[in-house]
């Protein structure tokens, strides 16, 4: 008798995506992050839903409603910290997932890669708006600084900022609309993730060797379901360690002070996962130039397939390209560190050098390394 999963229309869909899916036999733990991102998304939606039941998106009560969740709601503290630190885990998995794609040449699956970039932008927008909701000092001033970047748009900039704010400053109208978008965007992200998977299953997964895996495939279940569950447990171990031992490690102490438009914090900075882009923004003295550099630091990912000059897909057997890749990783870590430092010497100079190096590595060094490798292997 044919199993139900192969006959029922709904079960058939799940079966083809998660159970009988033919997968390459040699994919490593680096291929775990897709499923971990799915788990993070579910966690964020569930915890966010429970937080939304008790949160009030009003400038006069938002801060105290978060305090109420932490103090008075049953297990409110763990729901809140799971949501806040879950976002950090989400971005760690996201960066590792993108890093894997860059290293193993997964960006050559254009549709999947482009939907992935849209997913990254949507996730960043969601996280930014979520950071505003507790209505602490860093929430308020972070929102003010980041939304103010729109004023750099020529001619319509000021009108654009006031349109986003819903007034002449970040206030109640801003908070209400940010809450609305923060609530709806994760569901849009879920739809985009389904699209991401749809495009991926059109081509099949890449593998570390960067060669065709058509001759040698295995069923996704039980081999990769077990592997993914192991990854999930490791992720939960990290997340729960963070939540239960040092829940405020990645947060900002200023956010425990209620938003005050008359008092500016000494160092305004976004959450840690935006610091690399923030450092690039601050490195350009001109406002419009800074905003363009900020946008390009993310959108440059869309140019990666066009900059691929190598004759091999994966970097596994390309030592020069590996060198440029790890240079890029170190550079991003440097930018993240600089983004959290005050705007003073020597941090300004380090930030500017790192920003130039970031774009140079992607636009010049990586394609050049690939061309040299082609010559060395006589693959011209």
From Swiss-Prot:
Its main location: mitochondrion. The chain crosses the membrane at residues 33-53, 77-98, 113-133, 178-198, 226-246, 288-308, 320-340, 347-367. Signal peptide: none annotated. InterPro entries: Cyt_b/b6_C, Cyt_b/b6_C_sf, Cyt_b/b6_N, Cytb/b6-like_sf, Cytochrome_b, Cytochrome_b_C_euk/bac, Cytochrome_b_N_euk/bac, Di-haem_cyt_TM. It is a multi-pass membrane protein. Its cofactor is heme b. One of its GO terms (cellular component) is respiratory chain complex III. Binds 2 heme b groups non-covalently. Heme b b566 binds at residues 97, 196. CDD domains: cytochrome_b_C, Cytochrome_b_N. It is found in: Mitochondrion inner membrane. The keyword Membrane applies. It holds the Pfam family Cytochrom_B_C. A ubiquinone binds at residue 201. Heme b b562 binds at residues 83, 182. One of its GO terms (biological process) is mitochondrial electron transport, ubiquinol to cytochrome c. It comes from the Eukaryota. GO terms for molecular function: metal ion binding; ubiquinol-cytochrome-c reductase activity. Keywords: Electron transport, Heme, Iron, Membrane, Metal-binding, Mitochondrion, Mitochondrion inner membrane, Respiratory chain, Transmembrane, Transmembrane helix, Transport, Ubiquinone. The cytochrome bc1 complex contains 11 subunits: 3 respiratory subunits (MT-CYB, CYC1 and UQCRFS1), 2 core proteins (UQCRC1 and UQCRC2) and 6 low-molecular weight proteins (UQCRH/QCR6, UQCRB/QCR7, UQCRQ/QCR8, UQCR10/QCR9, UQCR11/QCR10 and a cleavage product of UQCRFS1). This cytochrome bc1 complex then forms a dimer. Belongs to the cytochrome b family. Heme 1 (or BL or b562) is low-potential and absorbs at about 562 nm, and heme 2 (or BH or b566) is high-potential and absorbs at about 566 nm. This is Cytochrome b. It comes from Hylobates muelleri. The gene is MT-CYB.
